[in-house]
From Swiss-Prot:
Residues 332-351 have a biased composition (Pro residues). Required for proper alignment of chromosomes at metaphase and their accurate segregation during mitosis. Involved in the maintenance of spindle microtubules attachment to the kinetochore during sister chromatid biorientation. May recruit CENPE and CENPF to the kinetochore. One of its GO terms (biological process) is sister chromatid biorientation. The modification N-acetylmethionine is found at M1. Residues 88-475, 603-625 are annotated as: Disordered. It is found in: Nucleus; Chromosome; Chromosome, Centromere, Kinetochore; Cytoplasm, Cytoskeleton, Spindle. It comes from Mus musculus. There is a cross-link at K479, K555, K596, K660, K679 (Glycyl lysine isopeptide (Lys-Gly) (interchain with G-Cter in SUMO2)). Interacts with MAD2L2. Interacts with POGZ, CBX1, CBX3 and CBX5. This is Chromosome alignment-maintaining phosphoprotein 1. The modification Phosphothreonine is found at T371, T447, T593.
Length: 802
């Protein structure tokens, strides 16, 4: 057998294709490659039987394609396949081909049998066993085997011609194969199916090996038989069948012989060509490869197949007329036959697809298998892509809304301090400056930025095209002339959500310059924050423009504004006095605005401006003075070009929003300080220590034997089991918390104003959920909002141009 294998696989080298290993024989190289290079296992020929071993990388397991056999050692699966599936594979392939021959030529059965014994007693022996087997297999394979049969006959004729050596080893298997073919012809194919299956398995691995060994002769035989294959249908076909060798090579015959057979018989070979000569080439080296497709069905599947009904096989043959296909192509050639086969034994089919698509592709027509099984890899890649796309969508939406030019964002920071000075009231600034407030506020800042500030949404609001910004800036220039009017215009025109903007602007108008410092920003933040991030930015920006950034307006507008500013500022002051109370309340409501963003955004120049603004706030300058200072800064900064001025305006707008946020954050800090003081008054560590102690890295409950690694677990235990009062209580609502961090988050939520969606009636106190809603609502109403904004901005732009 070994000699035959060597003869059959002269092209196969004893060297490993992936390293410098050189084996003593083919099996040695196979075991080396499977053990040392398992990642290439799917493309390896298992004992010359085809790509029957699948390597599962995740579990580091080797699987048999034809059954459920699994092992962590390649050698175990290799020997399993050579022992269990070598003979059965040959038989499964041959019977398929033979039944097809039988169907094509019902007269030929007897001649092949006679010829087989004549050729060799060994052949004669297999033939008797084959009749039963052939009968069994023929029913299941009838169409396929029949189709394959003629080509097999051709190889038979050529087989003997090829060489006596291959014939000798192959004859037993071939004879058995040929004999089964005539038997199925004689007997009804349906009844014969089980028998054929058995003989397929029955043929000793030796016969299989011999058949494999005579892969070259099959080639010749196939070529010579090309003409004979059609004749196989006629009485000549039995004659061909008589030569056991041709049968061996043709059925289990190396893929090479099958290739010529395909070429020889135009119809059957056509389907087999579908498999592609390349696939067949590997098969010659691995006579089992053709078997693999059948193995894919698995011997188990073959058995059920016959009982199930020859129909599936028939359908498969119809799918593949070629005798060779009957063995392999049957599965690949037509999805239909494959489906029935799985129904016969779903188990084997499942493992096969789960195996590697590569192996399936090689064994079966690559096209058909690729599409149905789609390797798990393809599925994986697919879903991740979907996931990726889905994930990016949300950020993209946010970004799309934000499309504010980076320039606008950048310039903003330096202006923010200015905004702070005019916008923030001295009182607010003082607390913010105080270290205590800042210390406490950072937590709130963290929460607030995540909650109230949606940097992306804000960007998106800013993201409105520069034209919108320009228009808003122009509106600002108009604002100094008539604060109330300009505010209204800016609110309607510049804010992305006109409705929200108008609402926000109204309070702003009522508020005076000073109240704006402390309150205007917080109020707009309230209105703006609830509004979609876009409304926030624009609403905030228009406000900042109105109050603080009038100077940022174009020079011409700024000058006129500066002249009118004092008068307006006086009026605003009067309004501020009236609205100061409301502003203070609003400020208290805005606790969650983030300071971190403001600090990061501020540049050294902004810090200087901040100092100046703080001094002004300390002096409690009038709003007119603030406006003048702003105008001066704008004059100094924006004397370059109109475009530069516009950029400055954008920056100032961005930072006016930040100023508002800072104001809110300072208020938050105040609340937090109060809370911490009250909390300490509530309960002290000493009181907690009464019920809990720490030792050896663990916390112990003094009331019982409970102990835990973390303090929080023991606190929960004390509260739930021993009714100990929670150490941290909220002074606003009285709710108790076990951990200080939980209480801080709760208090911060109290400080936050109710978030309202500008596009619908949605309201929420939870910034995280509100942000999710905004993403949904924005994507839904984005187009409508953009249209409205464009329309609103067009009118102010036209006025400015005039």
């Amino acid at each position: 057998m070994e000699v035959c294998q060597e003869l059959r696989k002269p092209a196969l080298s004893l060297e490993c294709g992936h390293c410098s290993f050189r084996g003593t024989d083919y099996e040695n190289v196979q075991l080396h490659m499977g053990s040392i290079h398992p990642e290439f296992c799917d493309d390896m020929d298992a004992g010359g039987l085809g790509k029957l071993i699948f390597y599962q990388k995740s579990a580091k397991l080797f699987h048999c394609h034809k059954c459920f056999f699994t092992s962590k050692l390649y050698a175990n699966v290799y020997y399993h396949i050579t022992a269990r599936h070598a003979a059965s594979d040959k038989w499964s392939e041959q019977p398929k081909e033979q039944p097809s021959k039988d169907t094509e030529s019902g007269k030929s059965p007897s001649p092949p049998e006679r010829q087989n014994p004549a050729f060799d007693p060994a052949e004669a022996r297999p033939t008797p066993a084959l009749p039963m087997e052939a009968q069994k297999t023929s029913p299941s394979l009838c169409p396929e085997s029949q189709a394959s049969g003629p080509p097999v006959l051709e190889p038979q004729g050529a087989g003997p011609l090829i060489s006596p050596e291959p014939q000798a080893p192959c004859l037993p298997a071939e004879a058995s194969k040929a004999a089964p073919v005539p038997c199925p012809e004689r007997v009804d194919p349906p009844c014969e199916l089980p028998e054929l299956e058995k003989p397929e398995r029955g043929p000793s691995p030796e016969s299989v090996k011999s058949a494999l060994v005579s892969s070259k002769p099959p080639k010749h035989s196939s070529f010579a038989d090309t003409g004979a294959a059609p004749s196989a249908l006629s009485p000549e076909s039995p004659v061909l069948a008589t030569s056991p060798e041709p049968w061996g090579p043709s059925l289990s015959a190396s893929p090479e012989s099958r290739k010529p057979a395909r070429t020889a018989s135009p119809e059957p070979r056509k389907p087999s060509p579908a498999e592609s000569p390349e696939l067949w080439k590997p098969f010659p080296a691995i006579a089992s490869e053709p078997r693999r497709p059948t193995p894919a069905v698995s011997p188990g599947s073959w058995k059920p197949g016959p009982p199930g009904s020859p129909r599936p096989w028939k359908s498969s043959p119809s799918a593949t007329s070629g005798p060779w296909k009957s063995s392999k192509p049957v599965q690949p050639m037509s999805p239909g036959p494959w489906k029935p086969i799985p129904s016969v034994s779903p188990g084997p089919w499942k493992p096969a697809p789960s195996m590697s698509t590569a192996s399936w592709k090689s064994s079966v027509s690559s096209g058909s298998w690729k599409t149905p099984p789609t390797s798990p890899e393809s599925w994986k890649s697919g879903p991740p892509e979907l996931r990726k796309t889905a994930l990016p969508l949300s950020p993209e939406h946010w970004k799309a809304v934000p499309p504010v030019s980076p320039e606008l964002r950048r310039p903003g920071p330096p202006l923010s301090p200015e905004i702070r000075s005019p916008a923030g009231s001295p009182e607010l600034k003082k607390p913010s400056s105080s270290p205590d407030l800042w210390k406490v506020s950072p937590d709130q800042r963290k929460t607030s930025p995540a909650s109230l500030d949606f940097p992306e949404p804000q960007k998106s609001s800013c993201g409105s095209p520069p034209d919108l910004w320009k228009s808003s800036f122009i509106m600002e220039s108009q604002k100094p002339n008539v604060f109330s009017e300009t505010r209204k215009h800016t609110a309607s025109g510049s804010s992305e959500s006109p409705k929200v903007a108008s609402d926000i602007w109204k309070p702003v108008l009522s508020i005076d310059a000073e109240p704006r410092k402390s309150t205007l920003f917080p109020e707009p933040t309230k209105a703006v924050l609830p509004a979609s991030p876009e409304p926030r930015k624009r609403a905030l920006f228009p406000e900042s423009r109105k109050h603080v950034f009038l100077p940022e307006l174009p020079k011409s507008a700024v000058f006129s504004d500066a002249q009118k500013a004092p008068e307006l500022s006086e009026e605003i002051q009067l309004e501020a006095v009236d609205n100061a109370k409301c502003d203070s309340l609003a400020q208290e409501g805005l606790l969650a605005t983030p300071k971190k963003l403001l600090d990061e955004a501020l540049s050294p120049s902004s810090k200087k401006l901040k100092k100046d603004s703080q001094e002004n706030s300390d002096a409690e300058l009038s709003s007119s003075e603030y406006i003048r200072a702003d105008l001066d800064t704008l004059d100094t900064k924006g004397q370059e070009s109109s475009s530069d001025q516009e950029q400055v305006d954008v920056e100032s707008i961005d930072f006016s929003k930040e100023n508002k946020m800072e104001m809110g954050s300072t208020e938050q800090a105040k609340n937090v300080l109060q809370f911490t003081e009250e909390k300490e008054a509530f309960i002290s560590e000493e009181e907690i220590a009464k019920y809990m102690k720490r030792g050896k890295g663990k916390y112990y409950c003094k009331i019982c034997c409970c102990r835990a690694m973390k303090k929080g677990a023991v606190l929960h235990h004390l509260v739930n089991k021993h009714n100990v009062h929670s150490p941290y209580k909220c002074t606003i609502c009285g709710k108790a918390f076990l951990l200080e961090s939980l209480l801080k988050n709760h208090v911060a939520a109290h400080g936050q104003s109710l978030l309202k969606c500008p596009r619908c009636n949605f309201e929420s106190n939870f910034p995280r959920g509100f942000k999710k809603h905004l993403t949904h609502c924005q994507s839904r109403h984005n187009e409508e909002v953009n249209k409205k904004l464009m329309e609103a901005l067009e009118s102010p732009l036209e006025e400015q141009q005039i």
